[in-house]
C-alpha cells in the first residue's frame, strides 16, 4: 500500500457541469461523479472520457463522499499515510493527510465552507487507521470476525460516507476504505526461527463521540461517551489469541463544564431519567459481550463522589444488580496509601478474568471463546482506566503465552511479551487521551509533566474543543438536507435503521414522505405543559420574611385562575412544567463574570417543593446564565418517553459580550415530538425597540444544540421571558386604561404586537389574548405601579409565546394569565398548553417504511433504454428520448452507454417509475424503445430487517416503565462543600426524608411544605441541588418497580389529602406579616384567586420496601 493507487481527474470545462473521474490500480474502468450521481465506466469509456479531464491528485484511497451542505458534497481522498505494522498479511496504515475534492463546484472547497479546514485537521490528526486488504477489517475483533460477516457499525467511522455509493450500486469493498478511530500498535516478536506479532488495538466508538467537556455520560439510547474496545492480540504462525476489554463513560445523564485546571465539578441530570439509558447500556453490553463486570475507579473528592454515589445507587436499583458484579475502587486514594493496592483490586477482578477467558483459534478452528468482558471507568476513562486495563492485560498475557505454547525451550518469551505489552499499553493510553482530552495520559511518574499536560488540557478544552466537536459531528452525519427533516425522521424511525441504511441519508424525498405519513402509525398522546416566567428583580427580597405568608408560589403555578392545570376534582396535573426566572441575581459586574448559583439552588428547591404539594415531579434540567435561569420538571410517568435533552445559551448584553442580557434554551423530545423552551431577557428601555429585535434575532441565530440543531429545528417552540417590549403611551394613559379595563387600547400600542405585525420579531409565533393588567413596573410589596422618580409607564414586559411547526400541529392554549406575587417589581405570568404528541411503535414503523419504499421507486433513479431489434443504442436517438423525459418532468443527472444500452440516471425514483410509461413507444415512427429499471427488486433489497433487540432499543419497554414507576425516589444527603459543583436535583418531589443525624447548626423545627412559599431566607446550611451521598435508608425504601400508569388522568380521590414532605425549617420565626399598603389603582379581581392557607399536613408514610428484583436470564453470548 506504499503506492498511491488512486488517480483523481477533473473536467474543468465551465461549459459542462462539474465532473470527477476516479481510477484505481487493479480495477478495470473508473467511477464517474456528475450531477450528484455516481456511475461506473468500462475501460473503453474511461479512455475516451479521460481525454477531457486533468489529473488533480494521486491518493492512497478514498473514504467516501461527504455532504457538507445541502448543495455541496466532497470526495474525501487519503493523501498521506504512515505504516504501523502488519496484521494478517495486511499493512495497517495511519492517516496523516486528506484532501477534499468538490463534486459540484470548480473552485477550492475551502472557499465554500470554512469548516473544511477544521475537518481536515481532524482527519489528519493521526487518530484514524485502515487496512490495506479487504480480508482484514479493522473494525472487528478476532472473535467478531468469526461470528459476523459485516463491519461493526460502532467502530466504522466513515460508514455514512459510503452511502452515496451504495445508493447507486457501487461495490464499496473494491473502491472505498473502511477506517476506525483510536489506536493501533504492532510489535514483532521472534521466537526461535518463528516470527510473531503482538498488537494492541483500541477502537473508539462513533455512536457518542466528542471531546472531553462537550460529551459526557450517556444518551437516551444507552450509548456512552469515550467508549473504547481494546483488543490485546498475539499472533504466531496460524495461532491467534485475543483478549477484549472495554471502557466508557458512566452511563448516566451528566456533564462536566470544566474551565479550570484540574476541575472535577459535575452536573448531574435528574436521577430517574437516567434509568432507561442505564438499562439500555447494560443490555447492549450483555447482547454484544455476554457476561461482564463493572470496575468503577471514581474517588471521593468534589464531584466524583456525587457521580460515584449516583452510579452505585443506579446499579443497585437495576435488575442487573444480581447479575453484574460492581467493583468499587478509589484508585487515587488507595494508590496514595500504597502502590501495591492494585494487587487487592486484581484479586477482586481475578475471578472474572478467569471465568471470561479469551479467544483462541488455530487456523480456522475455534479452540476457545471469550465469554465476557470487564468494563472499567474513571471520570474521563483515561489515566486511571488505562492503568487498571494495563494490569488486566499483563496478567492475562501469561495465560495467552501459555496457550500459544511459546515457552517451550524459550524461558524469556513470556517476559519479553510482557515488556512489549507494558510499552504498548503506555502508548495506547497516550493516544486515547490525545483523542479525548488533547494531551497524553497523566501517569503520575512526573509531577511536572502531569501539571504541564493538565494545563495543556485546559487550554485545549476551552479554546479548541468546540471546533473539534463540530468536525466530529460533520464527519459522522454530514448535512445532506434539511436538518429539521432529518431530526424528525430520527424521532420516528428506529435508530438502527438510520445508522445502517443509506436510504434515510441519501433519499430526502422518501424521508419527507415518512415524516408526512407518520401520523398513520402514531398513537396520539395529549400532554399538558405549564410555562411560567417571572423577573424576580435580583432576588432583593428573597430573604424578607415579613410578607412570606401573604402569597405563595402555588398561587402562580397552581393558581385557581388556571384550573385547567390543576383541579381538585379531577387532579389533572401538567405533565411538564417549564419555569423561567429573570434577574435571579443582581446584574452587577461581579455576577457577570461569575454568577452565584445559590439563588438558583434555592429557587429550584422551592419550585420543587411547591410542585410536590400535588404530585411527584422529576427535575429534568436547570441552567443559569447570569440572571436568566430556566427550570424544567416532568411527571415520572412521562419520564421514560423523554429523550435527547440538551442545553444551550447565548449572551446578548453589550453586543453579546456580557450575560446581563441573554437566553437559556432547553430541547427535549417527548415521544416523537421535539419541543424547545427558550427563556430570554432582552434589552431594557422605552425606546430600545431595535435592540430588542436584535436580541431576538441573535438568539434565534446563535442558539445551537448538538448536531447543529437550531430553535427552528423543533416541532413545538415555547419562548418565555422578560422581553422588555413597552407600550407606546404615557404612564397616565396606561394607568387610566388599566382602571377602565380597556386592554384593547393597550394592545394596539404594545411594541411587541406592533413589531410582530411588521415581521420584525417573533415571526410565526402565537400569543394568547392579553386580558390581564400590565405586569411591570410595580412598587415592591404593593399593587401600585411605579411611584419612583422615573415613574416608568406600565407595560407587558413578561410574555409567553409559542409556535407549532407541524403541518397538522395541535397545540392549544388553555389559559394565559398573571399572578399576584408582590416580592418583585414584576408580576409572574403563566400559561397552560395542551400539546398533542405522537407515540410511534417500531413494528408499525416497519410497515410504513415498506409502503413508502415501494411507492418512491428505486433510490438510484436509473433506467436502461434500448432499441428493439438493435444490438447497440444509436447515439442520435438520445435527444428525442431526452425530450420525452422532459415531458414527464424528469431531470437527467447522468447518462452513459453500457453494454450497448443507454443508462440514464434521473433525479428521483418516482421519475424512474414514471419513465416506465415510455416502454414500447415508437420514436420517429419506426424504432420502438424498451425501458426497464436498473434495480427492479429495490423494494425487497431495502426491506428493513429489525431484530427484537433493535426494537427494544427504540421502544420503551415495560421493564423501563416499571423502573420509573415508583412514587418515592432515592433520598440523598446534601453537603455545603459541594456548592456550585452541581446544579440540578435528583429527587422525585414527594415523600419525606428519613430521620437522620444532623449537625446542631442544621437542626430546626419541622414545617410542612404547604407553609413554605418561595425562598425567603438563606438557609444556615446551603443544600446543593444534586445528590452528594445516598443514604442507606433511602436505598432500602426506594420503590423502583411500581408500574407506570398510562397517561390518562388518574382517578380523583377527594377524601385524600395531597402528599407532603416533612422538611427541616431553615428559616427563623418572625412576627406576623403586616398588611400590604393600599392600592392606588383598583385592579380587576383575579379570577378565582385564593390566598388561603395551604392544605393540612399529613403524617409521613414510609415507602414500602421494594419487591424482589426479577432475575432476567442472560442473552445469548454474542461477541
From Swiss-Prot:
GO MF annotation: an example: inositol-1,4,5-trisphosphate 5-phosphatase activity
| Region of interest: Catalytic | 532-826
Q: Where is this region: Disordered?
A: 986-1005, 1042-1119
Check the record and name the InterPro entries matching this protein: Endo/exonu/phosph_ase_sf, IP5, IPPc, Nucleotide-bd_a/b_plait_sf, SAC_dom, SYNJ1/2_RRM
Tell me the outcome of changing residue 380 to N. Answer: Normal synapse localization, locomotion and, endogenous and evoked excitatory postsynaptic currents
Skewed-composition ranges (Low complexity): 1050-1072
Gene Ontology BP terms? acetylcholine transport; cytoskeleton organization; endosome organization; gamma-aminobutyric acid transport; Golgi vesicle uncoating; locomotion; muscle contraction; necroptotic process
Report the gene knockout effect. Viable but small with slow grow and uncoordinated movements. Synaptic vesicles at neuromuscular synapses are reduced, arranged linearly and are dissociated from the synaptic active zone. Several defects in vesicle recycling including accumulation of endocytic pits at the neuromuscular junctions and accumulation of coated vesicles predominantly at synapses of neurons but also near the Golgi in cell bodies of neurons, muscles, hypodermis and gonadal sheath cells.
Tell me which Pfam families the record gives: DUF1866, Exo_endo_phos2, Syja_N
Q: Which residues form the SAC domain?
A: 119-438
CDD domains for this protein: INPP5c_Synj (cd09089)
Q: Give its localization.
A: Cytoplasmic vesicle, Secretory vesicle, Synaptic vesicle; Synapse
Compositionally skewed regions (Pro residues) per UniProt: 1073-1085, 1093-1119
User: What is the protein's major site of localization?
Assistant: cytoplasm
**Recorded E.C. number(s)?**
3.1.3.36
Annotated catalysed reactions: a 1,2-diacyl-sn-glycero-3-phospho-(1D-myo-inositol-4,5-bisphosphate) + H2O = a 1,2-diacyl-sn-glycero-3-phospho-(1D-myo-inositol 4-phosphate) + phosphate
Q: PROSITE patterns this protein is in?
A: SAC
Gene Ontology CC terms, in alphabetical order: cytoplasm; membrane; synapse; synaptic vesicle
> Mind listing the UniProt keywords for this protein, alphabetically?
Cytoplasmic vesicle, Endocytosis, Hydrolase, Synapse
The domain of life is Eukaryota
Q: What does this protein do?
A: Probable inositol 5-phosphatase which regulates synaptic vesicle recycling in neurons by regulating clathrin-mediated endocytosis.
What is recorded about the domains?
A: The Pro-rich domain is dispensable for endocytosis during the synaptic vesicle recycling, locomotion and for endogenous and evoked excitatory postsynaptic currents (EPSC) at neuromuscular junctions. May play a role together with the SAC domain in targeting unc-26 to synapses. The SAC domain, but not is catalytic activity, is required for targeting unc-26 to synapses, for locomotion and for normal endogenous and evoked excitatory postsynaptic currents (EPSC) at neuromuscular junctions.
Which family does this protein fall into?
Belongs to the synaptojanin family.
Protein name from the UniProt record: Synaptojanin
Organism name: Caenorhabditis elegans
The organism's lineage is: Eukaryota, Metazoa, Ecdysozoa, Nematoda, Chromadorea
Amino acid at each position: 500500500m506504499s503506492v498511491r493507487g488512486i488517480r483523481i481527474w477533473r473536467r474543468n470545462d465551465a461549459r459542462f457541469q462539474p465532473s470527477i473521474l476516479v481510477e484505481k490500480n487493479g480495477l478495470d474502468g473508473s467511477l464517474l461523479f456528475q450531477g450528484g450521481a455516481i456511475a461506473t465506466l468500462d475501460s473503453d469509456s474511461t479512455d475516451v472520457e479521460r481525454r477531457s479531464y486533468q489529473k488533480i491528485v494521486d491518493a492512497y484511497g478514498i473514504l467516501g463522499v461527504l455532504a457538507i451542505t445541502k448543495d455541496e458534497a466532497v470526495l474525501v481522498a487519503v493523501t498521506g499515510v504512515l505504516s504501523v505494522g502488519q496484521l494478517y498479511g495486511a499493512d495497517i496504515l495511519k492517516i496523516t493527510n486528506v484532501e477534499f475534492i468538490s463534486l459540484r463546484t470548480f473552485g477550492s472547497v475551502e472557499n465554500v465552507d470554512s469548516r473544511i479546514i477544521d475537518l481536515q485537521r481532524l482527519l489528519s490528526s493521526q487518530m484514524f487507521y485502515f487496512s490495506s486488504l479487504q480480508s482484514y477489517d479493522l473494525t472487528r475483533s478476532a472473535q467478531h470476525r468469526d461470528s459476523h460477516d459485516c463491519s461493526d457499525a460502532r467502530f466504522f467511522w466513515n460508514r455514512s460516507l459510503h452511502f452515496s455509493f451504495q445508493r447507486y450500486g457501487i461495490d464499496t469493498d473494491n473502491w472505498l476504505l473502511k477506517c476506525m478511530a483510536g489506536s493501533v500498535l504492532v510489535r514483532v516478536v521472534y521466537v526461535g526461527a518463528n516470527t510473531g506479532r503482538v498488537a494492541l488495538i483500541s477502537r473508539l466508538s462513533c455512536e457518542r463521540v466528542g471531546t472531553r467537556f462537550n460529551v459526557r455520560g450517556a444518551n437516551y439510547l444507552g450509548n456512552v461517551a469515550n467508549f473504547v474496545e481494546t483488543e490485546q492480540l498475539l499472533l504466531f504462525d496460524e495461532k491467534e489469541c485475543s483478549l477484549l476489554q472495554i471502557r466508557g463513560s458512566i452511563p448516566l445523564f451528566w456533564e462536566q463544564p470544566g474551565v479550570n485546571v484540574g476541575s472535577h465539578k459535575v452536573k448531574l441530570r435528574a436521577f430517574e431519567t437516567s434509568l432507561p439509558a442505564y438499562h439500555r447500556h447494560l443490555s447492549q453490553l450483555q447482547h454484544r459481550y455476554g457476561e461482564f463486570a463493572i470496575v468503577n475507579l471514581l474517588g471521593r473528592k468534589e464531584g466524583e463522589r456525587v457521580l460515584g454515589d449516583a452510579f452505585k445507587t443506579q446499579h443497585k436499583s437495576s435488575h442487573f444488580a444480581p447479575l453484574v458484579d460492581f467493583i468499587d475502587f478509589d484508585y487515587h486514594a488507595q494508590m496514595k496509601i500504597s502502590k501495591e493496592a492494585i494487587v487487592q483490586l486484581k484479586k477482586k477482578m481475578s475471578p472474572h478474568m478467569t471465568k471470561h477467558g479469551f479467544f483462541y483459534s488455530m487456523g480456522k478452528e475455534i479452540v476457545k471463546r471469550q465469554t465476557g468482558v470487564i468494563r472499567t471507568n474513571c471520570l474521563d476513562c483515561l489515566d486511571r482506566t488505562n492503568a487498571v486495563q494495563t494490569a488486566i492485560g499483563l496478567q492475562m498475557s501469561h495465560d495467552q503465552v501459555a496457550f500459544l505454547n511459546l515457552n517451550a525451550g524459550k524461558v524469556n518469551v513470556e517476559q519479553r511479551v510482557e515488556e512489549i505489552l507494558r510499552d504498548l499499553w503506555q502508548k495506547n493510553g497516550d493516544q486515547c487521551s490525545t483523542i479525548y482530552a488533547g494531551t497524553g495520559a497523566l501517569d503520575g511518574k512526573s509531577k511536572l509533566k502531569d501539571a504541564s499536560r493538565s494545563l495543556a488540557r485546559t487550554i485545549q478544552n476551552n479554546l479548541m474543543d468546540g471546533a473539534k466537536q463540530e468536525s466530529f459531528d460533520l464527519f459522522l452525519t454530514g448535512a445532506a438536507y434539511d436538518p429539521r427533516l432529518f431530526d424528525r425522521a430520527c424521532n420516528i424511525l428506529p435508530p438502527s435503521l438510520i445508522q445502517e441504511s443509506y436510504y434515510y441519508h441519501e433519499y430526502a424525498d422518501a424521508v419527507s414522505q415518512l415524516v408526512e405519513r407518520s401520523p398513520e402509525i402514531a398513537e396520539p398522546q395529549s400532554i399538558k405543559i405549564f410555562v411560567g416566567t417571572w423577573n424576580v428583580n435580583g432576588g432583593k427580597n428573597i430573604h424578607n420574611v415579613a410578607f412570606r405568608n401573604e402569597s405563595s408560589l402555588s398561587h402562580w403555578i397552581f393558581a385557581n385562575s388556571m384550573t385547567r392545570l390543576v383541579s381538585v376534582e379531577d387532579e389533572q396535573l401538567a405533565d411538564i412544567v417549564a419555569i423561567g426566572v429573570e434577574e435571579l441575581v443582581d446584574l452587577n459586574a461581579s455576577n457577570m463574570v461569575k454568577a452565584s448559583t445559590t439563588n438558583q439552588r434555592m429557587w429550584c428547591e422551592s419550585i420543587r417543593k411547591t410542585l410536590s404539594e400535588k404530585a411527584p415531579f422529576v427535575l429534568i434540567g436547570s441552567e443559569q446564565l447570569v440572571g436568566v435561569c430556566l427550570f424544567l420538571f416532568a411527571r415520572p410517568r412521562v419520564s421514560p418517553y423523554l429523550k435527547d435533552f440538551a442545553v444551550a445559551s447565548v449572551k446578548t448584553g453589550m453586543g453579546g459580550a456580557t450575560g446581563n442580557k441573554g437566553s437559556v434554551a432547553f430541547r427535549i423530545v417527548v415521544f416523537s415530538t421535539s419541543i424547545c423552551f427558550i427563556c430570554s431577557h432582552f434589552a431594557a428601555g422605552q425606546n430600545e425597540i431595535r435592540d430588542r429585535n436584535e436580541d431576538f434575532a441573535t438568539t434565534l441565530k446563535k442558539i445551537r444544540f448538538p448536531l447543529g440543531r437550531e430553535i427552528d429545528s423543533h416541532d413545538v417552540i415555547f419562548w418565555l421571558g422578560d422581553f422588555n417590549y413597552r407600550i407606546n403611551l404615557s404612564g397616565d394613559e396606561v394607568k387610566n386604561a388599566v382602571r377602565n379595563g380597556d386592554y384593547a387600547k393597550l394592545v394596539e400600542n404594545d411594541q411587541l404586537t406592533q413589531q410582530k405585525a411588521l415581521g420584525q420579531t417573533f415571526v410565526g409565533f402565537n400569543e394568547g389574548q392579553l386580558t390581564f393588567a400590565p405586569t411591570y413596573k410595580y412598587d415592591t410589596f404593593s399593587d401600585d405601579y411605579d411611584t419612583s422618580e422615573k415613574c416608568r409607564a406600565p407595560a407587558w414586559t413578561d410574555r409567553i409565546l409559542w409556535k407549532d411547526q407541524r403541518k397538522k400541529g395541535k397545540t392549544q392554549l388553555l389559559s394565559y394569565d398573571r399572578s399576584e406575587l408582590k416580592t418583585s417589581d414584576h408580576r409572574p405570568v403563566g400559561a397552560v398548553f395542551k400539546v398533542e404528541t405522537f407515540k410511534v411503535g417500531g413494528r408499525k414503523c416497519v410497515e410504513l417504511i415498506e409502503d413508502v419504499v415501494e411507492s418512491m421507486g428505486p433510490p438510484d433513479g436509473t433506467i436502461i433504454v434500448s432499441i428493439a431489434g438493435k444490438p447497440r443504442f444509436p447515439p442520435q436517438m438520445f435527444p428525442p428520448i431526452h425530450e420525452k423525459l422532459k415531458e414527464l418532468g424528469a431531470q437527467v443527472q447522468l447518462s452513459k452507454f453500457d453494454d450497448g444500452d443507454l443508462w440514464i440516471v434521473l433525479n428521483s425514483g418516482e421519475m424512474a417509475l414514471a419513465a416506465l410509461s415510455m416502454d414500447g413507444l415508437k420514436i420517429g415512427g419506426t424504432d420502438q424503445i424498451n425501458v426497464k429499471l436498473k434495480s427492479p427488486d429495490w423494494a425487497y433489497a431495502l426491506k428493513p430487517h429489525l431484530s427484537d433487540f433493535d426494537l427494544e432499543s427504540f421502544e420503551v419497554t415495560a421493564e423501563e416503565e416499571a423502573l420509573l414507576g415508583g412514587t418515592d425516589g432515592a433520598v440523598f444527603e446534601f453537603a455545603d462543600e459541594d456548592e456550585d459543583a452541581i446544579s440540578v436535583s435528583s429527587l422525585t418531589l414527594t415523600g419525606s426524608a428519613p430521620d437522620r443525624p444532623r449537625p446542631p447548626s442544621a437542626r430546626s423545627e419541622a414545617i410542612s411544605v404547604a407553609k413554605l412559599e418561595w425562598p425567603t431566607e438563606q438557609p444556615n446550611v446551603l443544600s446543593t441541588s444534586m445528590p452528594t451521598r445516598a443514604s442507606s435508608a433511602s436505598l432500602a425504601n426506594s420503590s423502583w418497580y411500581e408500574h407506570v400508569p398510562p397517561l390518562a388522568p388518574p382517578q380523583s380521590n377527594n377524601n385524600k389529602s395531597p402528599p407532603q414532605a416533612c422538611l427541616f425549617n431553615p428559616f427563623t420565626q418572625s412576627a406576623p406579616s403586616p398588611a400590604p399598603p393600599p392600592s392606588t389603582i383598583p385592579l380587576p379581581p383575579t379570577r378565582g384567586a385564593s390566598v388561603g392557607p395551604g392544605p393540612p399536613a399529613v403524617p409521613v408514610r414510609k415507602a414500602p420496601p421494594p419487591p424482589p428484583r426479577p432475575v432476567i436470564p442472560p442473552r445469548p453470548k454474542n461477541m
